[in-house]
Design a protein with these regions (language model features):
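Structural and coupling elements of P-loop NTPases
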Residues: 1-270
Length: 270
């Protein structure tokens, strides 16, 4: 109650299944509803945990069950969320065709979306997988997109959804859904649209509205020093680090002149 927005009814309550208890590390969890269904009490669960019987906890209280239930029961669907979200995160004309489509999360409207995260896979030479959300229109695997902040047009090579670290290909992604793609790299927080909808006039193109910049409350908390064994590999190191800086907007990269080492700092695993 102390931190919820004024005038809102936000709150959490274990008895209403808006609180889950468990362990992400060990893969188990429960809500009040799940305990009732299984005829268990919290004391039973904690006794098993104290005994170290993680296998029993995973088999009887798998973590995916309470997490999925809470998403379904408590999070608003994209259509409902867009009504109050878009006026706060998008700076364009809400009465325009695009503005109306964004507020309705309309899959038939103009394509508009945002890159929210970048995954760099060390198993594939730090290939960048861009993850984001379509807020309007339908994203097709044959589309080319215009990056409003970067002012560049890019074609995608693969479009799909992520399953852990793998991309599952799908032909199109309608508004309201998350997606993942290969083909290019850009900073997280970038707004994109269909390249076919970009105004011919450069001044108009430069003034296209973007989504609000992602705000991060954290500062870099982990640092690692890097030194190339072969000076000829400096360019390769710079290429990988530049990808990392785009993936983690909080990251910093500097040269320690005394040691000759490069210092990379960020909040993501380095």
């Amino acid at each position: 109650k102390k931190i919820r927005p004024e005038g809102s009814g936000w709150g959490v309550d274990f008895a209403k299944n808006s609180v889950a208890v468990g362990s992400a590390k060990h893969g188990w969890g429960f809500t009040y509803e799940i305990l009732l269904e299984k005829g268990l009490k919290p004391q039973d669960v904690f006794a098993k945990y104290k005994e170290g019987d993680i296998q029993w906890l995973r088999e009887n209280l798998p973590l995916d069950e309470p997490m999925l239930r809470m998403v379904v029961d408590h999070l608003p669907n994209p259509v409902e969320a867009s009504k109050y979200r878009i006026p706060h995160i998008w700076g364009g004309d809400l009465d325009s065709e695009l503005g109306q489509s964004l507020q309705k999360s309309d899959p038939k409207g103009p394509l508009y979306g945002m890159i929210t995260k970048i995954f760099l896979d060390p198993r594939r030479g730090y290939q960048a997988t861009l993850i984001g959300r379509v807020f309007s229109g339908t994203f097709d695997h044959t589309d080319s997109v215009y990056l409003i902040g970067g002012r560049s047009t890019n074609r995608i090579k693969r479009l799909g959804v992520m399953e852990i670290t793998d991309l599952l290909d799908i032909p199109r992604v309608p508004a309201g859904n998350l997606f993942a793609l290969y083909g290019f790299i850009c900073p997280s927080g970038e707004t994109f649209m269909s390249s076919n909808d970009v105004p011919k006039n450069k001044e108009e193109a430069y003034q296209l509205p973007t989504f609000e910049k992602i705000q991060y409350a954290c500062e870099p908390v982990v640092s690692r020093s890097i030194k190339a064994q072969d000076p000829q590999q400096i360019d390769k190191l710079t290429t990988v680090v530049s990808k990392w800086l785009q993936a983690d907007p909080t990251a910093m990269y500097r040269l320690d002149k005394e040691s000759g080492e490069f210092i990379l700092s960020g909040i993501d695993p380095l």
